[in-house]
A protein has these predicted regions:
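Aromatic-lined carbohydrate-recognition surfaces of secreted/lumenal glycan-active proteins
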Residues: 34-42, 100-105, 163-167, 213-256, ...
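Active-site-adjacent "subsite" loops/lids of carbohydrate-active enzymes
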Residues: 98-157, 195-216, 228
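Active-site neighborhood of glycoside hydrolase catalytic domains
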Residues: 146, 157, 161, 178-243
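Aromatic- and acidic-residue-enriched segments that line the glycan-binding/catalytic groove
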Residues: 78-81, 108-130, 165-203, 259-263, ...
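The substrate-binding groove and active-site-proximal loops of carbohydrate-active enzymes
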Residues: 35-44, 67-80, 129-146, 207-224, ...
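Hydrophobic targeting/anchoring helices
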Residues: 242-412, 504-505, 526, 549-553, ...
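A conserved amphipathic helix/loop scaffold
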Residues: 420, 436-440, 448-660, 666-679
Length: 679
């Protein structure tokens, strides 16, 4: 098997001895990220072990997670299952793999008849309307006792580390937050007041309040108390066993917790925390939560989280999960594209669910696609070594719910969970083939939604792209963005760009006619046609507080709903122009001339002499001759899976097949580097 790869010099930490990994924050490391995969215990036996082992060895896997679900058996049945776990751990350890155990807890929302039959009366996660499912609440002390026993049994089985799955979450299954009797009782204890479910719901409307903060604090304490108790249970068996958690998309805000704190609680004394980020390959294919979400949107969601945690000394890995692990539902090519984006981004280890299959009915596509790409993966890592992503800096606050001004009446569970987690700004850039980055400051940035009120001062240095809620939030903070009013419009029928002919549009939600403040230095970059009139749809305003490009819509109304309105060739050209206007004449290092459903990630070396660009095509059709706009002088120094030619000042690549990807690396002379503006 391929030897264990170490990313960076080991820190004195027991967890590093377990994973053989560093926090992955240093992009200059010569070694690649670790490759982690899972093997389901329920399918592991004497007749299947060799099948798994062969795939792990062929795939160059470093760390194995034996996955163990729903551990609620008792007596002989439980002991038999735990013996199988001990056998599996020993088998993979003897074969040279670092081996841990992945397990679930509160539940995925489906009914759990075996559990309910043994333990009737469990508290279930409850949404504002009173609906429940099979997921149990963290406030249930009986269930906590069951989980303490489970993690102790796993520790005794010989696991080097334990990873709790993303069902350790109090939202999603079935709603936004939890208002079960347990949480309502905790809220009363904290505030001295009785609350109904509906009254808690209404805390998430209008202006921020002490009551909203109190409820989120209660939610957070119930989760941290649950996790602290699990950590203590493992310590009673072996404090040398580290624990980590898989993030759900609501973990970073709606749960009321701080994920760094939660990760450190679970990790235990002397262990470096580890955290699997949220954002799975299957989301665009089978998850009903975000209809219209693209694979690029998912990748940007993971990249955003990585940006938050890059310098916090936490081991990060991604969620490359093609659930239900059938390639006719989630294409194997998507797993490879996701993998390429995260390797190009850097700073995140690879958690690739390519062995989660039944050997009796094997799904070979994921392993075979991975093996076929291994040599090129190594080349890709080299092309992006010592680089950092460039483009518009996406500004997103990790914690925002306590401070947001929210719609009245309540906007609904779906809108709340998305606005408290995903980035509408990143999705807008992605729909237009415009590269983005999630760390650094100084270059042009973008922020959508009311969360813009939380922007740090350094976000203003390079100018900002805003939607209407972001602009109004900054105005309420006393920032002069140059806007006098945003007037709601009947649905616009068309939009023109920089004085051009109007093009038909069909936006979602409310659009606005923008009215600049009197006397402001303003330029109209676009106009809506609504009710027979033309009104500004995009303004560039220069004020004493900065330079702002304002779009006449609510980004979260558009998110995952109207990609054709957001993404167009005209909009792409407009964004390139905005970048130059915000940066005082600097230019985007790279962008697509026509996105065509492709995803682009661009990265510059620290000295600016190398520009590497990854293109991915998750679509069902090939893209003929994709074209990159790259300003100034440059030369092609390396290509991977493509051919490149300069035509009319742009870089034209060979056709990109459906599910295909390619990389081009350019040498950038000093004269061109001076034209770039990057965080």
């Amino acid at each position: 098997m391929i030897a264990m790869k170490r990313l960076f010099p080991l820190i004195a930490s027991a967890l590093l001895a377990v994973l053989g990994a560093g926090s992955c924050a240093d992009r200059t490391a010569a070694e690649p990220p670790l490759l982690i995969t899972q093997v389901p215990l329920d399918y592991f036996n004497d007749s299947t072990a060799a099948v798994y082992l062969a795939d792990l060895q062929r795939g160059g896997v470093d760390v194995v997670l034996v996955s163990l679900e729903e551990v609620f058996q008792t007596g002989a049945a439980r002991e038999a299952r735990m013996q199988r776990l001990r056998d599996a751990i020993r088998y993979f350890e003897d074969a040279g793999f670092r081996t841990g155990v992945w397990t679930n807890s509160l539940g995925y929302g489906g009914l759990r008849p075996e559990l309910e039959a043994q333990y009737p009366g469990l508290l279930h996660l409850t949404e504002f309307g009173g609906r429940t499912g099979g997921a149990v609440c963290s406030t249930d002390t009986l269930f906590l006792g069951l989980m303490r026993r489970t993690v102790q049994d796993i520790a005794r089985a010989g696991a080097r580390f334990i990873l709790m799955d993303d069902d350790l979450v109090q939202s999603v299954r079935p709603g936004f937050t939890c208002v079960c009797p347990g949480h309502l009782a905790l809220l009363k204890a904290a505030t001295g007041k009785d609350y109904t479910r509906e009254q808690v719901r209404d805390l998430f409307t209008g202006a921020p309040s002490a009551e909203r903060t109190a409820f989120l604090d209660v939610m957070g304490r119930s989760m941290t108390d649950f996790c602290r108790s699990l950590r203590e249970a493992v310590d009673e068996v072996d404090p040398g066993i580290a624990m980590g958690i898989c993030a759900s998309y609501t973990h970073f805000d709606a749960e009321g917790v701080d994920m760094e704190e939660l990760s450190r609680i679970l990790a235990g004394q002397g262990h470096q925390p580890f955290l699997r980020l949220s954002g799975a390959t299957y989301w665009p294919a089978v998850a009903p939560r975000f209809p219209g979400q693209t694979l690029g949107d998912v990748a940007d969601f993971v990249r955003m989280q990585a940006g938050w945690y890059r310098d916090r000394d936490i081991i990060l890995f991604d969620e490359n999960d093609p659930y239900p692990r059938k390639s006719d539902i989630v294409p194997a090519a998507w797993c490879e594209l996701y993998d390429k984006v995260m390797m190009a981004e850097g700073g995140v280890h690879r958690h690739k669910y390519m062995c989660c299959y039944q050997p009796q009915q094997p799904e070979r596509a994921y392993v075979e696609a991975h093996v076929a790409d291994m040599e090129d993966d190594a080349v890709l890592l080299g092309l992006f070594r010592s680089t950092a992503p460039c483009g518009f800096r996406v500004w997103e606050a990790e914690h925002r719910l306590r401070d947001l001004c929210l719609p009245v009446p309540y906007a609904g569970n779906g809108r709340m969970m998305v606005e408290a987690s995903h980035s509408a700004a990143a999705a807008f850039l992605g729909a237009n083939g415009v590269p983005s980055c999630y760390t650094g400051a100084g270059g042009p940035g973008i922020a959508f939604g009311d969360q813009a009120r939380l922007l740090p001062s350094e976000a203003f240095a390079g100018g900002l792209v805003l939607d209407v809620p972001a602009a109004l939030a900054l105005l309420s903070r006393g920032v002069d963005v140059g806007l006098a009013a945003a007037q709601p419009l009947d649905a616009p029928s068309a939009e023109s760009f920089d004085g051009g002919e109007p093009q038909p549009v069909s936006p979602a939600g409310t659009c606005y006619g923008l009215v600049p403040r009197e006397g402001v230095d303003v330029r109209v970059l676009g106009e809506f046609v609504a009710g027979g009139k033309r009104v500004p749809s995009c303004l560039l305003c220069r004020t004493p507080d900065g330079t702002f490009a304002i779009y006449g819509w609510d980004g979260y109304d558009q998110l995952f709903r109207q990609p054709r309105f957001w993404g167009s060739t005209d909009r792409m050209h407009q964004l390139r122009e905005i970048y130059t206007l915000l940066s005082g004449g600097k230019e985007l290092p790279a962008s697509l001339r026509d996105a065509g459903g492709m995803y682009a990630l661009a990265a510059l070396s620290a000295d600016g002499k190398r520009l590497s660009v990854l293109l991915c095509n998750p679509g069902k059709d090939a893209v003929s001759a994709p074209c990159l706009e790259i300003p100034g002088k440059w030369s092609v120094s390396r290509t991977l899976r493509t051919e490149a030619a300069r035509e009319d000042g742009a870089l034209v690549l060979s056709s990109l097949p459906a599910g295909g990807w390619c990389v081009v690396q350019l040498a950038i002379p000093a004269s061109t580097r001076r034209r770039f503006s990057c965080p």
